[in-house]
UniProtKB/Swiss-Prot annotation:
It comes from the Bacteria. NDH-1 is composed of 14 different subunits. Subunits NuoA, H, J, K, L, M, N constitute the membrane sector of the complex. One of its GO terms (molecular function) is quinone binding. The lineage of its organism: Bacteria, Pseudomonadati, Spirochaetota, Spirochaetia, Leptospirales. GO terms for biological process: ATP synthesis coupled electron transport. It is found in: Cell inner membrane. It is a multi-pass membrane protein. It comes from Leptospira borgpetersenii serovar Hardjo-bovis (strain JB197). It catalyses: a quinone + NADH + 5 H(+)(in) = a quinol + NAD(+) + 4 H(+)(out). The gene is nuoK. InterPro entries: NADH_UbQ_OxRdtase_chain4L/K (IPR001133), NUOK/Mnh_C1-like (IPR039428). This is NADH-quinone oxidoreductase subunit K. NDH-1 shuttles electrons from NADH, via FMN and iron-sulfur (Fe-S) centers, to quinones in the respiratory chain. The immediate electron acceptor for the enzyme in this species is believed to be ubiquinone. Couples the redox reaction to proton translocation (for every two electrons transferred, four hydrogen ions are translocated across the cytoplasmic membrane), and thus conserves the redox energy in a proton gradient.
Length: 106
């Protein structure tokens, strides 16, 4: 196993992925806007993609890079469906804050 990828130690990539993941989790926990929560979820998914690509390159395997393509496709579909739902709720409730979205009461 190579501990260097393109002249950069592997743990730098993992630390960067951990920082991005932490920022994403903090964004999900703190933000109230549904759009910003979706952006934070995308950060989390991209940090996982970075880990997949890092280990794929370090172990000279293609499996991690193939998984990244599937994760990116699923993330794009999730973002499109999620934003469509947020837009539909925004038209009804006139807000995109998740605290004020209560669909049980119209």
């Amino acid at each position: 196993m190579s501990l260097w990828i393109s002249g950069i130690p592997i743990h730098y990539y993992l630390i960067l992925a951990m920082i991005i993941f932490t920022i994403g989790v903090a964004g999900v926990m703190v933000r109230r806007s549904a759009v910003l929560i979706f952006m934070s979820v995308e950060l989390i998914l991209n940090s996982v993609n970075l880990v997949f690509v890092t280990f794929s390159k370090a172990l000279y395997q293609v499996d991690g890079e193939v998984v990244v393509f599937f994760v990116m496709a699923i993330a794009a579909a999730e973002a499109a469906i999620g934003l469509a739902i947020v837009i539909a709720i925004h038209r009804i409730k006139k807000t995109s804050y998740v605290d004020e979205m209560n669909l049980m009461k119209w």
